Regions:
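Class I SAM-dependent transferase core
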Residues: 1-70, 100-117
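Non-DNA-binding regulatory cores of transcription-related proteins
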Residues: 120-122, 149, 168, 174
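Short glycine-rich anion-binding loops that position phosphate/pyrophosphate groups of nucleotides
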Residues: 138-141, 173
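Conserved SAM/SAH cofactor-binding pocket of Class I
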Residues: 55-139, 146
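Conserved beta-strand segments of alpha/beta enzyme cores
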Residues: 91, 116-118, 164, 185-188
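Active-site capping/gating segments
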Residues: 170-208
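A short, conserved alpha-helix within the catalytic core of class I
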Residues: 142-153
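Conserved beta-strand signature within the Rossmann-like core of class I S-adenosyl-L-methionine
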Residues: 157-172
Length: 208
């Protein structure tokens, strides 16, 4: 199974979750041939570079049932779709300013039977809803992201981790994180996933 790498790090998946993860390979290959949401050279690394990378967020927080999460700039559905599979009792809204990409996310979510995932063609500035967490993957510098999504963070807490932004990023982030140095937390993904690709990849958490 292509999704064996997911099972390696998340051994407690249900049969439904395993099936949903397995279906992603064919679905993303088919859609990527029509609408480019993953670079052509990277599609063979879908599970490691996109699905497992998205699930790194689950290594720093187990979202409680009923948690509302906004995936800002989801592209073709990352990190939102893998997280929605892993946390079926949470609600995910996936937004992106590019309609073609959101169509892919919607079609994939429909095909695997995700009921807790709402993709919408929308710019972040226009999102009015309230969420416990905003997640993103290499969308924009953290200070810019925070300016846009601060309005969307709910004041009501229901998780062990205070509400805020969780962002997947790579490389040297010192300058980007400096404005938040007193409260931001950076975790190396290589702490959890041993594949070479995850070196210099980080989970950035900022309570808001």
């Amino acid at each position: 199974m292509a999704a064996d790498i997911i099972l390696k790090y998340f051994p407690d998946l249900t049969e439904t979750q395993q099936r949903q993860f397995d279906m992603l390979d064919t679905l993303y290959r088919d859609w990527n041939a029509k609408i480019n949401v993953i670079s052509r050279k990277d599609i063979d690394q879908l599970y490691e570079h996109h699905v497992l990378h998205s699930l790194a967020i689950a290594k720093i927080i187990r979202f409680r049932p009923g948690t509302r999460i906004l995936d800002f700039g989801t592209g073709g559905g990352f990190p939102g779709i893998p997280l929605a599979i892993l946390f079926p009792e949470c609600q995910f809204k996936l937004i992106d300013g590019t309609g073609k990409k959101i169509r892919v996310a919607q079609e994939v979510a429909n095909a695997i039977g995700l009921k807790n995932c709402e993709p919408e063609h929308l710019r972040g500035e226009d999102e009015k809803g309230k969420f416990d967490f905003v997640v993103s993957r290499a969308v924009m510098p953290l200070p810019d992201l925070v300016k846009i999504v601060r309005k969307n963070i709910s004041k009501t807490q229901q998780n062990a981790l205070p509400n805020g932004v969780i962002s997947l990023k790579g490389g040297d982030l010192q300058a980007e994180l400096r404005p938040f140095y007193k409260i931001v937390e950076s975790t190396d993904i290589s702490t959890f996933f041993k594949e070479e690709w995850f070196k210099e990849k980080h989970i950035i958490y900022l309570p808001i």
